[in-house]
């Protein structure tokens, strides 16, 4: 769950891993759909605020981009989604290049391009001023502290040119927002709909994407529960169980048989609807009913959280898992990793 088996360079699915046995499935969210939503959210904001968003009036709407992990398929998709929507992406082997641009104040980088946007009879240039992978010295990616340091470096050099801040997730986005963007009234866009980011929308955070973590967490444990019970994998998902738990395909999730993957569908969270997302750890009402312990007896499960320091995984995903495990009669041992080495988790198996 959460990180789909894939090629770290291309993002191509590892179908061999996904077909390990009959009970192997992936649970996550629709990365491409969410990435497109984030990109469109940023573009819509720029169009709606074009007259005021160009802070120094140079006709260039400049943005900086915090990239979580250059080898992570979700990070790749989000970088591509933003660049595609804004028109700054360039083709690389049939897909938008997701390579960090480094510093690109003069627009000379090869992995991105300047785009043109016509709004209200005026033509603006959109430029990715800088982007980098937020990896710390210990090797941990999606690192919020590194993002906070990066925005400090960027603003010291070309702060008056930064009109928008974009991040592959809210952890990094909030770090940059709190370090600089909030005080300078620069809209910041993230991903995950973490509770602090949703609350910050009232203070100028531009928006975020809810990856329907409540549905993801349920699906993660439900697939496990069904495998342990030896019932059809769709039980309690697309087909109601005896308690009445059931999701709506096409609205709450989609299933790809070819990819053996369940994907929660994403929702854009902006100033118009953020109050509906203030409690990120609330179970989804459609699948909130307790299973009968006589038919689904308590089972012990070992579940690893590969990066326990990640804001989304620790503050949203794991609490949701913990809220669902009792409903599904699962006794779960949650093992937190460091986001760097597999042995940090596997060494605990003995």
Give the positions of each predicted feature.
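A residue-level marker of the well-folded mature domains of exported/periplasmic proteins
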Residues: 1-350
């Amino acid at each position: 769950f959460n990180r789909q088996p894939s090629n770290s360079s291309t993002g191509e699915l590892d179908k061999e891993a996904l077909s390990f046995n009959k009970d192997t499935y992936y649970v996550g969210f629709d990365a491409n759909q969410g990435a497109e939503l984030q990109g469109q959210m940023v573009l819509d904001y720029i169009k709606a605020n074009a007259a005021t968003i160009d802070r120094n009036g140079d006709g260039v709407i400049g943005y900086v981009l915090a990239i979580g992990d250059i080898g992570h398929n979700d990070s790749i998709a989000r970088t591509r989604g933003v660049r595609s929507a804004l028109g700054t992406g360039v083709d690389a082997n049939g897909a938008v290049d997701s390579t960090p641009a480094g510093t690109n104040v003069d627009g000379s980088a090869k992995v991105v391009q300047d785009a043109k946007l016509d709004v209200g009879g005026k033509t603006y240039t959109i430029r990715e001023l800088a982007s980098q992978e937020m990896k710390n010295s210990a090797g941990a990616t999606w690192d919020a502290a590194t993002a906070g340091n990066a925005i400090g470096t960027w603003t010291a050099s070309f702060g008056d040119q930064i009109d928008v801040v974009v991040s592959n997730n809210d952890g990094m986005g909030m770090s940059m927002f709190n370090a600089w963007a909030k005080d300078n009234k620069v809209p910041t866009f993230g991903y995950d709909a973490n509770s602090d980011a949703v609350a910050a929308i009232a203070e100028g955070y531009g928006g975020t994407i809810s990856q329907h973590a409540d549905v993801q967490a349920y699906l993660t444990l439900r697939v496990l529960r069904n495998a342990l019970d030896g019932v059809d994998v769709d039980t309690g998902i697309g087909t109601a169980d005896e308690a009445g738990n059931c999701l709506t395909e096409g609205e709450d999730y989609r299933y790809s048989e070819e990819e053996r993957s369940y994907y929660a569908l994403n929702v854009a969270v902006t100033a118009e609807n953020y109050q509906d997302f203030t409690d990120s750890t609330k179970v989804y009402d459609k699948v909130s009913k307790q299973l009968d312990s006589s038919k689904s007896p308590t089972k012990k499960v070992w579940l690893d959280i590969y990066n326990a320091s990640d804001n989304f995984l620790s503050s949203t995903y794991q609490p949701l898992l913990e809220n669902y495990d009792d409903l599904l009669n699962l006794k779960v041992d949650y093992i937190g990793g460091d986001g760097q080495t597999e042995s940090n988790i596997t060494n605990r198996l003995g």
